[in-house]
Amino acid sequence: MKFIILALCVAAASALSGDQIGLVQSTYGKVKGDSVGILYAVFKADPTIQAAFPQFVGKDLDAIKGGAEFSTHAGRIVGFLGGVIDDLPNIGKHVDALVATHKPRGVTHAQFNNFRAAFIAYLKGHVDYTAAVEAAWGATFDAFFGAVFAKM
């Protein structure tokens, strides 16, 4: 059953139109330089995500936001997302990498969905978030997280 779900998710990623891929890549290009702001928005929206990182447990988010450790970690997370976006519609290797690092840590589907919601909220405040952009990002996250969830 998981194979069928995964096959459907990969097919969905492959079904992203060139226009959708272009919209996702261009809007991401406008925000990828603000990795600290993106991670801050994610942690602010769901403190359980911040609590999943031992170096940030129990620390005041506003106090750590300006630190080098936070900036480095934000760069890793946003960089990984950038790799997914750059490789669209080919998400397979990124799915396996994310599952390999997040499944053993007990990251939940809810936390992934909260990451998605916080990232989208961040995007809405920083790009021209049209209906077409919304549909493109929705299809991208549906395909990527659908494939991740099938393996978790």
Swiss-Prot record:
Matching SUPFAM superfamilies: Globin-like
Binding site for heme b: H73, H102
Keywords: Heme, Iron, Metal-binding, Oxygen transport, Signal, Transport
UniProt-listed InterPro entries: Erythrocruorin, Globin, Globin-like_sf, Globin/Proto, Mb-like_M
Similarity field: Belongs to the globin family.
CDD domains associated with the record: Mb-like (cd01040)
Domain of life: Eukaryota
Annotated Globin domain residues: 16-152
Protein name per the record: Globin CTT-E/E'
Extent of the signal sequence: 1-15
Gene Ontology cellular component list: extracellular region; hemoglobin complex
Source organism: Chironomus thummi thummi
Keyword Transport applies: yes
A Pfam family annotated for this UniProt entry: Globin
One GO MF term: oxygen binding
Gene3D superfamilies membership: Globins (1.10.490.10)
